[in-house]
């Protein structure tokens, strides 16, 4: 008797299987039940340096393992991990990140070089967003020297200009694209920093390597620029292929309380 019923049972099972599959939800809502077509195009992300038909310019370096790190020949190294991976059974991909706050395009807070400011809480969260956002002048610096008082005077930066991005030989040499830290980068000498403080209305200084201060005047220049807590330093900017002139600058650091520096995303709008 059972032998006669076996074929009928198998037939019934085969008929019910499609219904069961249709009623069973996908293992993950991000993936459809239907297998992907072999002819389906795989989407490719678009990497852009300009947006809005060239009106919005990204002047932030993207983070990579071989970007320069302060006084290191090995670059930043691995800074991103994926401890939770959908490929390994997690419900979502979740990355972790660890890197120095003064790496890539970043901002300095007064506590970077003043211990009493650091202790008092003059951190990244205390920076004035109005200073970090507004009209800015992009200038080309003479390529033969660091930024001295004489050079600052020769630039003839008008009074009233509050934000200046200094493009230097660092951009021509593509130093931010080299893994090895280079002490010969162009930056402010102490007298150039003092001239800026004494003779201009500049409240934001941007430059195209990891420090606004020349390596030989590293701390003295920082002290001059950050002493009064009214100047913000943005370092490691990507300024190639941009015409000098006036732009609308928008920079937003991470809101890090207790940190004297932070990665920052900066754009220019024509």
Swiss-Prot record:
Keyword Transferase: no
Signal sequence residues: 1-23
Key words of the record: Extracellular matrix, Secreted, Signal, Stress response
GO cellular component terms, semicolon-separated: extracellular region
Main location: secreted
Tissue spec. comment: Highly expressed in leaf sheaths. leaf collars and flag leaves. Expressed in roots, stems, glumes, young panicles and pistils.
Subcellular location: Secreted, Extracellular space, Extracellular matrix
MF terms (GO), sorted A to Z: arylformamidase activity
Any one GO BP annotation for this protein: L-tryptophan catabolic process to kynurenine
Induction of its expression: Induced by cold, salt and drought stresses. Induced by abscisic acid, auxine, brassinosteroid, ethylene, gibberellin, jasmonate, kinetin, reactive oxygen species and salicylate.
Its job: May be involved in response to stresses.
Protein family according to the UniProt entry: Belongs to the Cyclase 1 superfamily.
Protein name: Cyclase-like protein 3
Organism: Oryza sativa subsp. japonica (Rice)
Upper classification of the organism: Eukaryota, Viridiplantae, Streptophyta, Embryophyta, Tracheophyta
């Amino acid at each position: 008797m059972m032998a006669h019923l076996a074929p009928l049972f198998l037939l019934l099972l085969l008929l019910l299987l499609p219904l069961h599959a249709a009623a069973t939800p996908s293992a993950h809502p991000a993936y459809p039940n239907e297998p992907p077509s072999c002819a389906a195009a795989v989407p490719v992300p678009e990497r852009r340096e300009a947006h809005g038909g060239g009106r919005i310019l990204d002047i932030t370096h993207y983070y990579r393992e071989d970007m320069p790190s302060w006084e290191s020949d090995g670059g930043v190294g691995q800074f991103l991990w994926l401890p939770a991976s959908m490929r390994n059974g997690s419900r979502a991909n979740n990355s972790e990140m660890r890197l120095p706050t003064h790496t890539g395009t970043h901002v300095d807070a007064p506590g970077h070089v003043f211990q009493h400011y650091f202790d008092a809480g003059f951190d990244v969260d205390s920076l004035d967003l109005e200073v970090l956002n507004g009209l800015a002048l992009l200038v080309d610096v003479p390529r033969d020297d660091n930024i001295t008082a004489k050079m600052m005077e020769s630039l003839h930066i008008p009074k009233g200009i509050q934000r200046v991005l200094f493009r230097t030989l660092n951009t021509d040499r593509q130093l931010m694209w080299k893994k090895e830290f280079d002490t010969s980068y162009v930056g402010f000498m102490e007298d150039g920093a003092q001239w800026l403080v004494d003779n201009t209305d500049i409240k934001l200084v941007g430059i195209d390597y990891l420090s606004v201060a020349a390596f030989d005047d590293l701390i003295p220049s920082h002290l001059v620029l950050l002493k009064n807590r009214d100047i913000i330093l943005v370092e490691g900017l990507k300024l190639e292929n941009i015409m000098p002139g006036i732009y609308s600058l928008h920079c937003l650091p991470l809101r890090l309380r207790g940190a004297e520096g932070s990665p920052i995303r900066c754009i220019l709008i024509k």
